[in-house]
Amino acid sequence: MNNEDKKLQDEQLQKETVEAAETVSAEEEFVEITAEEMQIARIAELEAALLSSDAKVKEAQDNVLRARAEGENVRRRSEVEIDKARKFALNKFTEELLPVIDNLERAIETADKNDEALKSMIEGVELTLKTMTATVEKFGLKQHNPVGEVFNPEFHQAMSIQESADHEPNTVMLVMQKGYELNGRIIRPAMVMVSKAAAGSVDMQA
């Protein structure tokens, strides 16, 4: 092999070496780019999973809050319904009881207290009325006996109006039937006779 051939062979070998080195460098660069892209993709995947987890946690928290709120609403509605049922039952019972109280009061008022034979019976009726009244008062029943009070249509029902020189106009002169309220609500207005100015007199309230 002469020098020229050897030179050509060396050049060819050098060229192949350079090409091989360039190929290896390109492959290494490709591997580096691919690894970086995979890392970015993995990070994006993890971020997406984290966001999804956060959304699921928030959804679960919202569900818990809604369940608690609904439970509280159910509890409150139940309490209201129970209270309504209790008040309705108590109101109904009281309305049925009022005529009994009225009859006991009338029996005492009309009884001949001078009759010794009736004395023990009257005392028994008075004790019964007192016990019954004290019992129903514990449940919020209050009696209205508005003699001498100014007439109030919210609490009184005027059965008649009479002239009177002894009473201020619009004053309850007589109670025909006592009124009652239960826990602050009127269940029966008092039936009353109301005064008005006597004919020929001057109404100072006018």
Curated annotation (Swiss-Prot):
This is Protein GrpE. Homodimer. Belongs to the GrpE family. One of its GO terms (molecular function) is unfolded protein binding. It comes from Photobacterium profundum (strain SS9). PANTHER family: GRPE PROTEIN, GRPE PROTEIN HOMOLOG, MITOCHONDRIAL. Residues 1-18 have a biased composition (Basic and acidic residues). GO terms for cellular component: cytosol. The lineage of its organism: Bacteria, Pseudomonadati, Pseudomonadota, Gammaproteobacteria, Vibrionales.
